[in-house]
Amino acid sequence: MITQKTRWTFVWSFLLGLGVLLTGCTLESWDPVGGPSAENAAWTSEVQGEGQLRVIYLDVGQGASQLLISPSGRTMLIDAGNNDKEEEMLHYLQAYGVSRLDLVIGTHPDADHIGGLDRVIDRLDIGEIYMPKIQSNTKTFESLLNSIRRKGLKVKTAKAGRELAWDEQVQVKMLAPVAETDDNNNMSVVMKVTYGKTSFLLTGDAEAESERAMLESGANLSADVLLVGHHGSKSSTTARFLNAVKPKYAVIQVGDNSYGHPTKTVLDRLAKQQVKVYRNDLHGTVEISSDGGGYQITTERPG
C-alpha cells in the first residue's frame, strides 16, 4: 500500500524541446527514484530496472503513451502520442536512457496514439511490434507501416488471450480486442500487467462495447492502477467495468482539448469509488513504480 505521507523532492527533468530546468516533483511513499535527469540523458544500451516495474505515463498532451521498464531493465512502449509529439517522444526516451524497445504496442490506428511511433521506430532498435487487426487509410497509419517495413519488422497480431514473454518476473496479458469490429476505439489493445501482488490495466481508447466484451469473456479485470479509457470520455469507463476493475489509482492521459475530456461523468464515477486520480494535464508525466508489493507514485507537477 502507498503510505499517506507526501513529500516534495526536486529532480532535474527535461523541458522538452527547450532544454533542461529544475521542476518540482511530488512523491508518495518510499525513497526518491530517478526520472528524466541531466545525469541519465545520454543514450545508453541498457536500462536499469533496479528490481522495480516502472510504468511511466508520458505527458504528450491530448494523446497517450506509456513507457514500461521491467525489473530486469527490459522496455516496452505503448503508443507514442500525436504526430506533433515525435521529437518530444525521442527526448523522453533519451531522458530515460532508452535506445532499444523490446516491445512496441500500437493500441489502435488513431493519430493521437500512433502518431509518434514512426519516428520512434526509425530511430531506435526495436524487438517486436504488436498491433490489432484493423486498417486505416490515413497518412499517419501509412507512415507507421512504412517505418515498420524499412526496419524489416513484422507486425504481430494483438488480441485477447495473448501473453507476451517480456520479463520472467512480470506477466503481460492482452485482454482485448476480444472480437473484430470496424470501430478503431473498440479494437484497442487492452493489457493487464502484473508484478507480484501489484497490477496495472492499460486500456487505450477502449469504449463500452469493448468493456462489455471483456466482462463477458470472464477475464480477470481487477487491477490496482487503471489507465482510464479514451482520455476520460463518457464513452468509456462504464460503471460495470469500473466495478470489475476496482482500482485504487487511475491515470487519465489528457491535454488541452475541445472534447470535454475528462468528462464529469467519468470523474464522478471514479470519485464515488474513492479512486485517487492523476492527470497529465494537471500533474505532467506520472510515474508509478512497483516493487511487487507496493507502489511509489511520482508526478512532474503537484497538480
PLM regions and their residue ranges:
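Non-globular, low-confidence helical/coil segments that flank catalytic cores
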Residues: 2-303
